[in-house]
């Protein structure tokens, strides 16, 4: 095998169009991201049809910019990695069809990547010496998982949400208190002005050994609190609501992740996904893990949000295991972690 394996990666699962060139799964030569946040902000959330059209408009330019920034041509690429699920089906298809076209035209192998696996792999970019096994908390707008990474590309899901993802709950609560979209960063910001002990919102407790999550109850409790105060004409302190809600979510995420570490006897927790940029989650997880002697690894913001570099990292580890993807692959919007 060559000393350096160069992956051209493409990500388009939601509202970011991204392309990257990644060497040996850990060195990023380029990571171009065209965000659609300003487009969807006025709608209060991502509109799938609009997202697909925006991907189509920019994908060629984004891929070319990634190659140019890396000072590469397609001849320098060993394989093409692309997200094929989970995500919005129309958005996924744009990136997938583009990648399939490149693979067909160049004869380069295609490697389909699970978006969640990509988020986990972002940690290999930031932490060059990181090796499995370790625990990973994946928290984003669409996904919440506790994953035990046994080996490269080999996962065991120990806990997942039974309803809303953590990021989804953040977005809905932010909308309810008039903060708009995207909700996560806005709740994080306003919470710094509030009292996290002001309101006691419930935490889901399944009363058994499960490490699963449920955030719909917390979200509903916030909405009920707001409705009751409004009906009585009472003043609502949005900062207190945001801070108390955030603490409820973060406490559950941290508690379950530490329990998972203890159950598997691992001393490293990696964090992945857009919600990993939340300051309360970062501070609470680091503080509580320190008490247990557990190391916490959190990539920088650019690697927490959707990006193609993480897809390139995951694709590399698939490549060296000899895994290749047929050109007849289709988008799988509900793809499960570990499915191939």
Curated annotation (Swiss-Prot):
Binding site for substrate: 138-142, 171, 184, 188, 278
Presence of keyword Iron: yes
Catalyzed reaction equations: L-threonylcarbamoyladenylate + adenosine(37) in tRNA = N(6)-L-threonylcarbamoyladenosine(37) in tRNA + AMP + H(+)
Keyword vocabulary terms for this entry: Acyltransferase, Cytoplasm, Iron, Metal-binding, Transferase, tRNA processing
A GO BP entry: tRNA threonylcarbamoyladenosine modification
UniProt superkingdom: Bacteria
Cofactor note as given: Binds 1 Fe(2+) ion per subunit.
Gene3D superfamilies named in the record: 3.30.420.40
Metal-binding is among the record's keywords: yes
GO CC term, one of those recorded: cytoplasm
Alphabetized GO MF terms: iron ion binding; N(6)-L-threonylcarbamoyladenine synthase activity
Entry EC number(s): 2.3.1.234
Top-rank EC class of the record's enzyme: transferase
Similarity comment: family membership: Belongs to the KAE1 / TsaD family.
Record's function text: Required for the formation of a threonylcarbamoyl group on adenosine at position 37 (t(6)A37) in tRNAs that read codons beginning with adenine. Is involved in the transfer of the threonylcarbamoyl moiety of threonylcarbamoyl-AMP (TC-AMP) to the N6 group of A37, together with TsaE and TsaB. TsaD likely plays a direct catalytic role in this reaction.
Protein name: tRNA N6-adenosine threonylcarbamoyltransferase
Organism lineage: Bacteria, Bacillati, Bacillota, Clostridia, Eubacteriales
């Amino acid at each position: 095998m060559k000393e350096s394996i160069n992956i051209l990666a493409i990500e388009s699962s939601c509202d970011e169009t991204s392309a990257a060139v990644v060497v040996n799964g850990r060195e990023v030569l380029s990571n171009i991201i065209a965000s659609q946040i300003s487009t969807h902000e006025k709608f209060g959330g991502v509109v799938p049809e609009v997202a697909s059209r925006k991907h189509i408009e920019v994908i060629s330019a984004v891929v070319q910019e990634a190659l140019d920034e890396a000072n590469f041509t397609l001849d320098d690429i060993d394989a093409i990695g692309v997200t094929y699920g989970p995500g919005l089906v129309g958005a996924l298809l744009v990136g997938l069809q583009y990648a399939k076209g490149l693979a067909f035209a160049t004869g380069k192998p295609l490697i389909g990547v699970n978006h969640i696996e990509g988020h986990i792999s972002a940690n290999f970019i930031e932490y060059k010496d990181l090796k499995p096994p370790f625990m990973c908390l994946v928290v984003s707008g669409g996904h919440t998982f506790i994953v035990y990474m046994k080996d490269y590309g080999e996962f065991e899901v120990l806990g997942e949400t039974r309803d809303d993802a953590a990021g989804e709950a953040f977005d809905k609560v932010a909308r309810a208190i008039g903060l708009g979209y995207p909700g996560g960063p806005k709740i994080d910001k306003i919470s710094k002005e509030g009292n996290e002990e002001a309101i006691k919102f419930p935490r889901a407790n399944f009363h058994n050994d499960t490490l699963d999550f449920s955030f719909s109850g917390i979200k509903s409790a916030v909405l009920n609190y707001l409705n009751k105060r409004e009906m009585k004409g009472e003043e609502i302190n949005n900062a207190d609501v945001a801070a108390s809600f955030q603490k409820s979510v973060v406490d559950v995420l941290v508690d379950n992740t530490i329990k998972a570490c203890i159950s598997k006897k691992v001393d490293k927790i990696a964090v992945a996904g857009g919600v990993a940029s939340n300051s309360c989650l970062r501070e609470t997880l680091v503080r509580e893990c320190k008490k247990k002697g557990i190391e916490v690894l959190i990539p920088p913001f650019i690697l927490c949000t959707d990006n193609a570099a993480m897809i390139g990292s995951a694709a590399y580890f698939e490549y060296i295991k000899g895994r290749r993807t047929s050109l007849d692959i289709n988008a799988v919007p509900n793809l499960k972690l570990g499915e191939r």
